[in-house]
């Protein structure tokens, strides 16, 4: 058994080797306007089939076949029915195209092969793809080829001209079919050796059936060879008999006439196959021909041999059962031929591989997975790989439903092979290749000799490159993926990025089973843009909300790298976001508390990343706009205070903290403190939690420390401390404090800048020093936000994330300008420059106030509108500047051609046209009657020069045109752009506002309770806690928490159950859709048609039984007549002869018909 992966360049060798083998290759140009060209080879009848097969692959570069259809039939002109013509022209060519098949047919333009050639021609003319073509190889005996001498005298390097005759044949000679492109011409063999063409074709079919090929170059499927019988004369029986002895399956088209109809009538009743019955069939199918009794007897023997291999024969009637396509019929014929009576799964693998290669999951369900065989996971591993590589999600689902265990199937080695099988034209292949090249150059820089030269052959990607690609897309959400699976290393991976030893590979055992097989397959499918398969893996895996959001993030990043497919990826990204949103809706409707916990729990499969973090990275605005997420954010925003508390009450408590201990502000009911062991154990259930917003660990600590606090300070001290923390720790209070203090900061800045800004040495004054200190506390807070937020992140990445926020950039600019302004202000020589810089800095600090509007439902979306309009203005200014410069330079050249002063040139070229847009038109320069200037040299130095009046009319015309374009056209264009931007944002105003609201709540949730300048106390507290290694207050626990293992598993199981409910509802909606109802109706109609076809088959069997009964009654009547004609010895003799006759007929024996004197058949009775 050999693997066929494609052309093998070493077989056969050069032209001299081919001549030694008797091969003479050449090219032929057919006449006519089409200028068709074909390749041919003249071979001896005894050539080895392996040499011929290698010639087709290596020399002619034909793609390795997944199926070979050998067309056998009538080689003389005959009347073809319309349905049979459609089967050949549409069904056969379509089946060959869809399955990657070769068609072996006659090379002569006559009979059945003529129609096949026309079908191939029509397909080549209609097809727009050069990659998908139908391979039709014509074989013929050289002795039957018209213009044979032209082909015999052809040289290999010089194409010969072959005349194309309209008739196609002259007596027994026929011309080559110009619709084919490859010809095998068999030279006549020695006399008495029979038909060399038939012998060679049989040996070639046998050799091809012993080769292996497969989709994707897997080389795991035996190449099936199917013989298709259409019409045919009785001499075809010898060909069929020898083929079935080689276990070649046959598909017989009923109604095509000739020997095909004879076989169709006799294949189901081999016990009645006697010469008399065969003769009757031959006379019916060939009424114009006369056959000798010796031929009848010989053909009857062949028919008996053929019908004894019924498992290789498939009879199909397209006139009555025409609802199925020919490729389906072919696959069923192959399944029937290779089907064994054994119940071992190994005996069904080849037919299962064929079904996978041809994507016929319906046949796999009905013929293979019908309950007769018990499949094990190990039996389906090979076909599972084929289905994954060739993107057959329905087969993957079928295998999983019938015993395939993905946990046992997916090892890291097999996952690595899946990534190595990605298409070379995909974006993933380019990314992996780029990462591999970066690693090679890194190792080369370290002096590794083997890494200096690029590896030969196709790139062998490893999971190391995959993990680096995923890290670019998912950042911290894939930390530790595909690294050493030892527990210690896994814990280190969760805490921080793993550091690989210099010059070493990842220590990952490729034989180890994947810890999260569904997640790994899901990522593999998403990276390859296989949406249907990825959706199935998502449905089968855990942590569905997090997985869908991770897919959103991946597709968003990939769309930035591949702009051509950005629209398609955006559609799929929205689909995954919809999956996450719908699944969370299902969870939220079932349990609000568990849904909140789902948002903040650290997902085990995604490197301890929360759903909120993934949604932020994926910019999933629709997810944040969900009512459940907003309800959770509302609880976080108000903390333990009652939601909806009036702002005036909050402001009163902020200005007078003693009011916190009154009933001015309502706090949540405080549950009685429980410190028993049973109470602590109750925390394992989410349903027993009073509020799911705070971390379980903090609640346990409160319960443990409660008796100590009561013992030390008493209940009143506990009440005062708890109320104080609840008020000042709420994000709404932090936000209010920052807003109030920021207004105070701006008021102080205004006072200093306008009233108390003294030059040195009198200044700076006390209020100005207070302003410096205030800005110093602002700087400390920005440093904390940039470098002291997440301990598990590198400083460079922290700074990158900090700079990525636009408001942080605004803060950096404001602080930088303030430092520059203060530095200049301290120098007497640069005092005015310092005032100028500080004045500009005040404007930046004031614009920073816009950020607080994000919490307002009406004003929040307007910030997005302003931001997008600024981008629109940038592109608008490009068009405006083109007209501005063109008009300004032209008018300057016409009005002031001799004025070379640079400041005046700039003023007239740019500044004056810009003012003219707003209506300030200098008539004293344009209107000749209003010109007022002097040409005196002493007055000309500081005053404008007199304009030139030579082309005054042209300047006025240019002014009119300029005002028309800028004031009417461009301004209206800008208004239209602004209107479109406003409509887009306003249409999604609620979604934009809710997303902004989330970012604002998270920001102030993580900020210290005190606002600048008092925030310095909070910074000192954090510093002291770090110095004394005392654990700081983890407000982050409200947005990220680690659940105990039993509780975490309970949440995961609950989410999985909700996902199953969601998928069942989706399936129900799909079943109730109009398209699905129509599909089911069509399926039922097909079922009824098949049922009626079965009734026709039963009717045929009844008629067959009636004919058999009639035949037996005739025999019985003849015996009775013989017995009734005489008595005595003569009667006995006749009786014995009659008995022998009946016995011989029922045995089906042929010896009695070959006795001397029995050359003629008995008369019909």
Curated annotation (Swiss-Prot):
Residue numbers carrying Phosphoserine: 129
Region listing for Disordered, in residue ranges: 481-505, 1126-1165
Protein's UniProt keywords contain Nucleotidyltransferase: no
Membrane-topology annotation of the record: Multi-pass membrane protein
Binding site for Ca(2+) 2: 782, 785, 808, 811, 1003
Catalysis performed (reactions): Na(+)(in) = Na(+)(out); K(+)(in) = K(+)(out)
GO CC entries: dendrite; membrane; monoatomic ion channel complex; neuronal cell body; plasma membrane
Coiled coil, from the record: 553-581
Extracellular topological domain: 756-765, 826-832, 895-903, 940-951
Positions in the Cytoplasmic compartment: 1-730, 786-806, 856-864, 987-1165
Entry's localization field: Cell membrane
Amino-acid positions noted as binding Ca(2+) 1 in the UniProt annotation, renumbered to this chain: 222, 338, 347, 350-351
Domain notes from UniProt: Contains two Ca(2+)-binding sites that are allosterically coupled. The binding site in the intracellular domain modulates the voltage dependence and the accessibility of Ca(2+) in the transmembrane domain.
Family recorded in the similarity comment: Belongs to the transient receptor (TC 1.A.4) family. LTrpC subfamily. TRPM5 sub-subfamily.
Record protein name field: Transient receptor potential cation channel subfamily M member 5
């Amino acid at each position: 058994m050999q693997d066929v992966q494609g052309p093998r360049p070493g077989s056969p060798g050069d032209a001299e080797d081919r001549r030694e083998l008797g091969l003479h290759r050449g090219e032929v140009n057919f006449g006519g306007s089409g200028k068709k060209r074909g390749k041919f080879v003249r071979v001896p009848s005894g050539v080895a089939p392996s040499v011929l097969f290698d010639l087709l692959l290596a020399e002619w570069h034909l793609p390795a076949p997944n199926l070979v259809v050998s067309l056998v039939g009538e080689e003389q002109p005959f009347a073809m029915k319309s349905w049979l013509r459609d089967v050949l022209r549409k069904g056969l060519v379509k089946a060959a195209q869809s399955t990657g098949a070769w068609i072996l047919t006659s090379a002569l333009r006559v009979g059945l092969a003529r129609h096949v050639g026309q079908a191939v021609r029509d397909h080549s003319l209609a097809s727009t793809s050069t990659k998908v073509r139908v391979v039709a190889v014509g074989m013929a005996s050289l002795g039957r080829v018209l213009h044979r001498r032209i082909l015999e005298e052809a040289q290999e390097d010089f194409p010969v001209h072959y005349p194309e005759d309209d008739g196609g044949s002259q007596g027994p000679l026929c011309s080559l079919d110009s619709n084919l492109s490859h010809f095998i011409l068999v030279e006549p063999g020695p006399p008495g050796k029979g038909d060399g063409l038939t012998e060679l074709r049989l040996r070639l079919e046998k050799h091809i059936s012993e080769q292996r090929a497969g989709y994707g170059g897997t080389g795991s499927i035996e190449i099936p060879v199917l013989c298709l019988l259409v019409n045919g004369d009785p001499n075809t029986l010898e060909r069929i008999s020898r083929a079935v002895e080689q276990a070649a399956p046959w598909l017989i088209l009923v109604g095509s006439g000739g020997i095909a109809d004879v076989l169709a009538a006799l294949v189901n009743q081999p016990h009645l196959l006697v010469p008399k019955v065969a003769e009757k069939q031959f006379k019916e199918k060939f009424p114009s021909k006369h056959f000798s009794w010796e031929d009848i007897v010989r053909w009857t023997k062949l028919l008996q041999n053929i019908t004894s291999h019924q498992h290789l024969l498939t009879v199909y009637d397209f006139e009555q059962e025409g609802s199925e396509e020919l490729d389906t019929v072919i696959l069923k014929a192959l399944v029937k031929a290779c089907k064994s009576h054994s119940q071992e799964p190994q005996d069904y693998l080849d037919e299962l591989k064929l079904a996978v290669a041809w994507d016929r999951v319906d046949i796999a369900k009905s013929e293979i997975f019908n309950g007769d065989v018990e499949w094990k996971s190990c039996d389906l591993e090979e076909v599972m790989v084929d289905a994954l590589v060739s993107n057959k999600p329905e087969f993957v689902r079928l295998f999983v439903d019938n015993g395939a265990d993905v946990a046992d199937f997916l090892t890291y080695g097999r996952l690595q092979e899946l990534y190595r099988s990605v298409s070379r034209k995909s974006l993933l292949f380019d990314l992996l290749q780029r990462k591999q090249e970066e690693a090679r150059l890194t190792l080369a820089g370290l002096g590794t000799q083997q890494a200096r030269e690029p590896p030969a052959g196709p790139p062998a990607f490893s999971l190391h490159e995959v993990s680096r690609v995923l890290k670019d897309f998912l950042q911290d959400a894939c930390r530790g993926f595909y690294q050493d699976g030892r527990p210690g290393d896994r814990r280190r991976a969760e805490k921080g990025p793993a550091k690989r030893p210099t010059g070493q590979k990842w220590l990952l055992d490729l034989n180890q089973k994947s810890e999260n097989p569904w997640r790994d397959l899901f990522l593999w499918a998403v990276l390859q843009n296989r949406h249907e398969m990825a959706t199935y893996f998502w449905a089968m895996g855990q942590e569905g909300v997090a997985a869908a959001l991770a897919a959103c993030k991946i597709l968003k990043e990939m769309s930035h790298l591949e702009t051509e497919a950005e629209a398609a990826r955006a559609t799929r990204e929205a689909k995954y976001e919809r999956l996450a949103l719908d699944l969370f809706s299902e969870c939220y409707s079932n349990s609000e508390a568990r849904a909140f916990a789902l948002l903040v729990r650290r997902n085990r499969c995604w490197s301890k990343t929360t759903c909120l973090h993934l949604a932020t990275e994926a910019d999933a605005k629709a997810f944040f706009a969900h009512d459940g997420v907003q309800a959770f954010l509302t609880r976080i925003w108000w903390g333990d205070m009652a939601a909806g508390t009036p702002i005036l009450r909050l402001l009163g408590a902020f200005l007078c903290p003693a009011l916190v201990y009154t009933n001015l502000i309502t706090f949540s009911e405080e549950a009685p403190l429980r410190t028993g062991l049973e109470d602590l154990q109750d925390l394992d259930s989410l349903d027993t939690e009073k509020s799911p917003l705070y971390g379980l660990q903090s609640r346990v600590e409160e319960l443990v420390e409660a008796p100590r606090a009561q013992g030390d300070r008493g209940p009143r001290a506990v009440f005062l401390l708890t109320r104080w923390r609840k008020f000042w720790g709420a994000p709404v209070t932090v936000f209010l404090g920052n807003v109030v203090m920021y207004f105070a900061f701006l008021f102080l800045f205004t006072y200093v800048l306008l009233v108390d800004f003294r030059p040195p040495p009198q200044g700076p004054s006390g209020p100005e020093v207070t302003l410096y200190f205030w800005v110093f506390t602002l700087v400390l807070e920005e440093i904390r936000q940039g470098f002291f937020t997440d301990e598990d992140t590198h400083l460079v990445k922290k700074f990158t994330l900090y700079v990525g926020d636009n408001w942080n950039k605004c803060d950096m600019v404001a602080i930088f300008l303030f430092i520059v302004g203060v530095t200049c202000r301290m120098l007497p020589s640069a005092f005015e420059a310092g005032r100028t810089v500080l004045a500009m800095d005040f404007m930046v600090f004031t614009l920073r106030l816009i950020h607080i509007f994000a919490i307002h439902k009406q004003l929040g979306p307007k910030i997005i509108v302003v931001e997008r309009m600024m981008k629109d203005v940038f592109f608008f200014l490009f068009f405006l500047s083109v007209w501005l410069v063109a008009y300004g330079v032209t008018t300057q050249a016409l009005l002031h051609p001799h004025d070379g002063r640079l400041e005046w040139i700039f003023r007239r070229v740019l500044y004056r046209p810009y003012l003219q847009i707003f209506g300030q038109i200098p008539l004293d320069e344009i209107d000749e009657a209003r010109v007022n200037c002097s040409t005196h040299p002493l007055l000309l130095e500081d005053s404008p020069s007199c304009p030139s009046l030579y082309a005054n009319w042209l300047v006025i015309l240019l002014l009119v045109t300029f005002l028309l374009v800028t004031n009417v056209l461009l301004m209206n264009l800008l208004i239209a752009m602004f209107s479109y931007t406003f409509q887009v944002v306003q249409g999604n105003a609620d979604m934009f506002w809710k997303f902004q609201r989330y970012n604002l709540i998270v920001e102030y949730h993580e900020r210290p309770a005190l606002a600048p300048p008092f925030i310095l106390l909070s910074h000192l507290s954090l510093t002291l806690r770090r110095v004394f290694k005392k654990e700081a207050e983890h407000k982050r626990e409200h947005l990220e928490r680690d659940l105990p293992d039993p509780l975490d598993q309970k949440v995961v199981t609950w989410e999985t159950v909700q996902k199953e409910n969601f998928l069942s509802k989706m399936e129900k909606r799909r079943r109730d859709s109009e398209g699905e109802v129509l599909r089911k109706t069509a399926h039922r109609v097909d079922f009824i048609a098949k049922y009626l076809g079965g009734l026709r088959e039963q009717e045929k069997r009844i008629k067959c039984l009636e004919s058999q009964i009639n035949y037996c009654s005739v025999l019985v009547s003849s015996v009775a007549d013989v017995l009734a004609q005489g008595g005595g010895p003569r009667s006995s003799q006749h009786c014995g002869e009659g008995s022998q006759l009946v016995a011989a007929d029922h045995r089906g024996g042929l010896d009695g018909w070959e006795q001397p004197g029995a050359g003629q058949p008995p008369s019909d009775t």
